[in-house]
Swiss-Prot record:
Its EC number is 5.2.1.8. InterPro entries: PPIase_dom_sf, Trig_fac, Trigger_fac_C, Trigger_fac_C_sf, Trigger_fac_ribosome-bd_bac, Trigger_fac_ribosome-bd_sf, Trigger_fact/SurA_dom_sf. Belongs to the FKBP-type PPIase family. Tig subfamily. Involved in protein export. Acts as a chaperone by maintaining the newly synthesized protein in an open conformation. Functions as a peptidyl-prolyl cis-trans isomerase. It comes from Xanthomonas campestris pv. campestris (strain B100). Keywords: Cell cycle, Cell division, Chaperone, Cytoplasm, Isomerase, Rotamase. One of its GO terms (biological process) is chaperone-mediated protein folding. This is Trigger factor. The gene is tig. Residues 157-242 form the PPIase FKBP-type domain. Consists of 3 domains; the N-terminus binds the ribosome, the middle domain has PPIase activity, while the C-terminus has intrinsic chaperone activity on its own. GO terms for cellular component: cytoplasm. It catalyses: [protein]-peptidylproline (omega=180) = [protein]-peptidylproline (omega=0).
Amino acid sequence: MQASIESTGNLERRLTFTLPQERLETHVGGRLRELARTTRIKGFRPGKVPTKVIEQRFGQQVRAEAMEGLLRETFDSAVREHSLRLAGNPRIDQGESDFDFVATFEVVPDFGDIDVTNLSVVRHTAEVTDADIDQMIENLRLQRRTWNPVERGAQVGDLVALETWSQAGNERLPAEGVETGSSVLGSGVMFDQIEKGLEGLSKGEDKALSIDFPADWRVPQLAGKTVQVHVKAVEVSEPVLPEVNKEFIKSFGVKSGDAEQFRADIRTNLERELKGALMNRLRREVGEQLIAAYAHVEMPPRLVENEARSMLAQQVDQMRRSGRNPGEIPADAHQGFMDAAAKRVLVGLLVGEVARRNELRLESKRVSETLRLIASTYEEPEQVIEMYRNDPQLMSGLRSRVMEEQVIDWIAERAKHTEQSLSFQDAIRV
């Protein structure tokens, strides 16, 4: 194989290589002959289609597919030959001829000796108690509550139907009439100042409130301004919670309506949630320790920039989903995420290095257990499992997640660690 490697930066490499033309032609010829034997074309007997006809119909597609496969195979072979470990995907450009290519990519930095025994990790523990199950049942009752109109002043927990209009300087919103809506006091859906202002209002009463809107508020006319918000309580209703009886229990999928089975199912769900929360805490603990120990190692610039752009895109998407206006995104907006992105990249590369150096292998049993755990949160678990198994992208993401968890556990077991007990509520709190 003709291939040469050169350094174009501390962590950037340029690989120039040539595809073996004979192998390409051999592959194309073999594929065309195979198609000639199996393709049915009107006017020709099966297996008797002339090669020229097959080439006219399929030659361009077959050659493109063969070129793509051989390009990938040749590049991978050159990477192995030069003992390169890529950080991210390469950019491959055409060279001087049809068979010459130039690949530019970044490599994993040299972390030196990775000694995880010097790390200090706090490993949190927690368990689901009967009180946690009681609280969850109370939350489920709140989900199924009905509302009873009352004549008294509004209290936390009440549902208030309201009318509002706002005055921002000389501008009234809406220009005419009022906006209508409703909110449960104490839910945090509205501004805290508005919720506090609604407390004590009875049906038909109104009040003017001075509210400071954040600069990124979804309504441009209000964003970053101090606004007079006029609110009127149209109706005040108190919650009526359902009894925990057989009908209530059956509504949550427990066909027998048995209270003990209901509590057992809730315990299973809470323990699943707790397991994920404790792993996330451990992931953060290990990540922070790795960052502190290896912050001096230079990260691949392009990989960090791509991660920063991905983080920006996620934030913009979250803002839009929550109704906030992200506004016009400057071309360099991702720069504000560069530090966080560098830390993410550092942890990701270190986790990969620990797995490689210690020959850690993906545990298929753990993959199956995790998949069953994910599927158990849906009404049709078997369909979810089948969906994953038939989707290579979903399975790849699942395997990556499980492998990362294996490495995190491996590091935590060998690091200096202390245990800290938490309540269930504290453990799941972000």
